[in-house]
Amino acid sequence: MMRVLLIRGMLVGVLAGLLSFGVARVLGEPPVDRAIAYEEQMVAGHVAGAGEAGHHHGTTTATVHDHGTAEEPVSRDTQRGIGLLTATVVYGAALGGLFAIVFGFVYGRVGPWDARTTALLLAVAAFLTVYLVPTIKYPANPPAVGIDGTIVYRTQLFFVMIAIAIAAMIVAVMVAKASAEARGAWDATLIGGAVFIGSVILAGMLMPTLDEVPANFPATVLAQFRMASLAIQGTLWATSVLTP
């Protein structure tokens, strides 16, 4: 049973990856290209400024690595094509397999729902904990946004926020189940929801805040990139409902 469910989950994940690739190509790549163009423009301006300063002072005052003219190890055509397709399909397959394993564990244990309803509720819970809550605190950024030296730190904070959100969801479900008999299903759901929301809000307030967006970075590009990220993740998790 679990083997069949795992295979089905991975196949659904591959489908989710293909759909997400389409969403990423249509919605995600345009703001990425504009962000890269912005980065190249900033580098070109920096190089020009450094060269002008060196001309006036008789020496070169700064050395700048020009990302715009340096040969890329992987071309943008490869990145937006086979690279993006491979990434979304592999990620989707792994996500689908993990979703199937978790579904097999929780089905029949968390409520009297049928398989499809359980899958839907699990997908919503996973979307909230693994993506939405951490992203609200630490949103996705396109190229040219962020400091290279803080990449590891930002990644660590994001995963800590995921762990907190998952723990908050587990506690919320336990509280809701404990309250259901005395308060009824509706009140128990509201209580569990309040526990989850309150917990993640408190955690978000206590976690470090990062603000690395350049002051002159186009706000529309940033918004488009983050909306595309939301659409991609939404596609992945919505498709996972087809697992059972």
Predicted regions and their residues:
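Juxtamembrane/disordered regions of integral membrane proteins
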Residues: 1-244
